[in-house]
């Protein structure tokens, strides 16, 4: 089973039904729900997601959505090493650097899924948009 790290932008697309991106993100979460892939999210994403999602709903509704998300995915820790690696990196976006190092430190992550691939140009992990991941996954599954 492939382990995929899901960036917060993809999760926001899914949870807010943000068009035109929500279709691909919903398919990825369907694959996770069907246990065809394993989804991973950093612990940092939860606070970022709460902040963004709170603009769309009540505290209670957002917490409920995040609880459901926590049941679907593995939550990867952000610790001292993660932050120090991010601070020492050449990433232009600090939040993305923390996401990247959280994914990289989890040795079983096979790829990172984001719509923001330009910020991960120096990644040692494969970085794909949701659309590219789905095409790759379908091609691999059918062969």
Identify the meaning behind each predicted range.
Residues 10-12, 16, 51, 96-102:
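Hydrophobic side chains within alpha-helical segments
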Residues 76-78, 127-130:
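Short acidic-hydrophobic, aromatic-tinged amphipathic segments that line or gate anion-handling sites
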Residues 71, 123-124:
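Short, structured coil segments at secondary-structure junctions
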Residues 1-40, 54-61, 122, 128, ...:
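Short, well-structured N-terminal submotif of metal-dependent ribonuclease cores
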Residues 74-117:
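Active-site neighborhoods of divalent-metal-dependent phosphate/nucleic-acid chemistry enzymes
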Residues 26, 44-48, 52-82:
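Active-site-proximal, substrate-binding regions of enzyme catalytic domains
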């Amino acid at each position: 089973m492939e382990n995929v790290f899901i960036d917060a932008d993809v999760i926001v697309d899914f949870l807010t039904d943000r068009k035109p991106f929500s279709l691909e993100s919903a398919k990825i979460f369907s694959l996770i729900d069907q246990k065809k892939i394993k989804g991973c999210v950093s612990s940092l994403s939860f606070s970022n997601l709460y902040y963004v999602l709170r603009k769309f709903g009540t505290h209670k509704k957002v917490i409920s959505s995040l609880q459901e998300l926590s049941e679907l995915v593995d939550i990867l820790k952000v610790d001292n090493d993660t932050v120090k690696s991010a601070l020492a990196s050449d990433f232009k976006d600090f939040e993305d650097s923390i996401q990247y190092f959280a994914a990289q430190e989890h040795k079983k992550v096979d790829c990172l899924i984001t719509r923001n691939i330009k910020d991960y140009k120096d990644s040692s992990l494969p970085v794909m948009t949701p659309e590219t991941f789905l095409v790759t996954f379908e091609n691999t599954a059918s062969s």
